[in-house]
Amino acid sequence: MSPQTETKASVGFKAGVKEYKLTYYTPEYETKDTDILAAFRVTPQPGVPPEEAGAAVAAESSTGTWTTVWTDGLTSLDRYKGRCYHIEPVPGETDQYICYVAYPLDLFEEGSVTNMFTSIVGNVFGFKALRALRLEDLRIPPAYIKTFQGPPHGIQVERDKLNKYGRPLLGCTIKPKLGLSAKNYGRAVYECLRGGLDFTKDDENVNSQPFMRWRDRFLFCAEAIYKSQAETGEIKGHYLNATAGTSEEMIKRAVFARELGVPIVMHDYLTGGFTANTSLAHYCRDNGLLLHIHRAMHAVIDRQKNHGIHFRVLAKALRMSGGDHIHSGTVVGKLEGERDITLGFVDLLRDDFIEKDRSRGIYFTQDWVSLPGVLPVASGGIHVWHMPALTEIFGDDSVLQFGGGTLGHPWGNAPGAVANRVALEACVKARNEGRDLASEGNVIIREAAKWSPELSAACEVWKEIRFDFKAVDTLDPEK
């Protein structure tokens, strides 16, 4: 460009590469109520200062690139850029830092978790200047939350639909997860529901395989639901997995479930994707269906302590995208989940206002401004001996799901369901009487087993089962 044709945008432009921290590290910045705030665990490459690493995260997840560009002069970077505004070392680690980044709200499309994640957890996670990067938490401002529908119905509406109050809901995943014919699958569902469970569930990888096509499964499960409801006088449900290879096919399956009159469908929200999940959540609200969410693939993303996305962020994203239930770990079962961390994101799922609490891994105060809550689902390696702990840890607003802990009963599915229902009712009754479930749990179960042969048999089968492994993802030590 000659001096005679120089444009206003190019005036003052100087080509080349400059340090990110000169533009994107702003420790004097005061965050706004409308900013999306992120807490990143940053592990820089040797020789990279934490200020440069934090600024690089802010830049590459917002307006920045590796070199200066003349089109910067066509917009206001101060208005749109992300800012690393605070950095603190991680206690007990020599090369890890928590970097706090503020993003202006105008960077994100309204009502789109997909767009939010594309920016905040996009290409920056492959940035060479960082050895590892993990998104620990997000503060979603009320102004952005109000652009989302959220869960199709929420906790209170679900209880009203089911007419079930004052206790956790009880579920079961049908096993074996793959290989059953549709008719045998429906029979297993019926036996569990008539035995006293509120829900049964498709496993996350049950979609529409050669051994059991989705339409056949839906029909036999609907028959099982209606037959068990007629026998027990209770409202029953089965999580019919609508997850499919295309969003159109997913919605078609949800439409068929609605036509059958069943109360709930299911989606694998991480493998299915946030766009598909939000579409399904909108359909479920419009058509009176509850939506159960499975988190298959989450551990690929969230299990490593120094790289990925913490599940509390995935849980917040799900509440925004939409779901009435989501699997949250058990604390006591076979799957990963430390107690304090798990209870932290359980509160983020259920409550309307959650204070910052680093002892539970919550980096920001979160106000959901009345967005409906999500029921946490405890599932994975649990059985009747775990019932007191689960009731005490998760409280009434939860779903406790016993797959092998129901279908593994020596007398069959229905007695397995009876054992779990008796154990749950005994724990709720004891808690309401003021007894301490943590210290008296085993006594409470043994007392109930005296008048329930089904529970007695279950207690005998699983009396030696333990999953005593330390969690991989743990809280940082205090300073």
Curated annotation (Swiss-Prot):
CDD domains: RuBisCO_large_I. The record marks 334 as: Transition state stabilizer. It catalyses: 2 (2R)-3-phosphoglycerate + 2 H(+) = D-ribulose 1,5-bisphosphate + CO2 + H2O; D-ribulose 1,5-bisphosphate + O2 = 2-phosphoglycolate + (2R)-3-phosphoglycerate + 2 H(+). Gene3D superfamilies: Ribulose bisphosphate carboxylase, large subunit, C-terminal domain (3.20.20.110), RuBisCO large subunit, N-terminal domain (3.30.70.150). GO terms for biological process: photorespiration; reductive pentose-phosphate cycle. Mg(2+) binds at residues 201, 203-204. Binds 1 Mg(2+) ion per subunit. GO terms for molecular function: magnesium ion binding; monooxygenase activity; ribulose-bisphosphate carboxylase activity. The modification N6,N6,N6-trimethyllysine is found at residue 14. Its EC number is 4.1.1.39. The modification N-acetylproline is found at residue 3. Substrate binds at residues 123, 173, 177, 295, 327, 379. Residues 1-2 form a propeptide. Its cofactor is Mg(2+). Its main location: plastid. The active site is at 175 (proton acceptor), 294 (proton acceptor). One of its GO terms (cellular component) is chloroplast. RuBisCO catalyzes two reactions: the carboxylation of D-ribulose 1,5-bisphosphate, the primary event in carbon dioxide fixation, as well as the oxidative fragmentation of the pentose substrate in the photorespiration process. Both reactions occur simultaneously and in competition at the same active site. The basic functional RuBisCO is composed of a large chain homodimer in a 'head-to-tail' conformation. In form I RuBisCO this homodimer is arranged in a barrel-like tetramer with the small subunits forming a tetrameric 'cap' on each end of the 'barrel'. Heterohexadecamer of 8 large chains and 8 small chains. Belongs to the RuBisCO large chain family. Type I subfamily. This is Ribulose bisphosphate carboxylase large chain.
